[in-house]
């Protein structure tokens, strides 16, 4: 079973994934290659900070929510993700997870949760493997940016919606 989690930044996708992990699911994030690449590049932020120093101190969630640097960290992630998809194809972030699932399942059905389904083709990938998409919404949560990755998925791709406060 593959469960893909969809929703704005900060609505609780990672918290939901942690609950599923306690039930035997393995967690994957489509953004993992983006984050690894950005840490290798280690861009400079303002006031002597680098991305790696910010992430080391705050974690990725803290870096993305940081009052001074959060918008820039998000902009870097979005730009790199867009560039990777343009240069290497829409599946550039999906393929590593596909390979990992194939390696770990060994012919059996693995229980997988993907924490960051943002685009229709990502949701279609989950569904094509017999999975489902859960949209997580929270009162007052708004998109972190105007980027296409912050738009809701088409309703036909969403199996369930969880709404919290």
What are these regions (language model features)?
Residues 5, 114:
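Hydrophobic anchor at the beta1->P-loop junction of P-loop NTPases
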Residues 32-109:
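ATP-dependent small-molecule kinase phosphotransfer cores
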Residues 23-26, 110-112, 132:
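Short active-site oxyanion
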Residues 16:
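Hydrophobic positions on the alpha1 helix immediately C-terminal to the Walker A/P-loop
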């Amino acid at each position: 079973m593959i469960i893909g989690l969809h929703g704005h930044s900060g609505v609780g996708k990672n918290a939901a994934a942690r609950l599923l992990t306690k039930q035997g699911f393995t967690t994957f994030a489509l953004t993992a290659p983006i984050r690894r690449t950005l840490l290798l590049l280690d861009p400079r932020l303002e006031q002597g900070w680098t991305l790696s120093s910010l992430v080391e101190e705050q974690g990725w969630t803290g870096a993305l929510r940081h009052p001074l640097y959060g918008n820039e960290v998000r902009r870097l992630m979005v730009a790199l993700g867009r560039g990777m998809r343009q240069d290497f194809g829409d599946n550039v972030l999906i393929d590593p997870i596909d390979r990992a699932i194939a390696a770990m399942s060994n012919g059996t059905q693995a229980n997988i949760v993907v924490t960051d389904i943002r685009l229709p083709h990502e949701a279609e990938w989950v569904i094509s493997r017999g999975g489902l998409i859960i949209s997580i919404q929270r009162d007052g949560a708004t998109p972190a940016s105007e980027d296409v990755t912050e738009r809701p998925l088409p309703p036909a791709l969403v199996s369930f919606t969880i709404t919290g406060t």
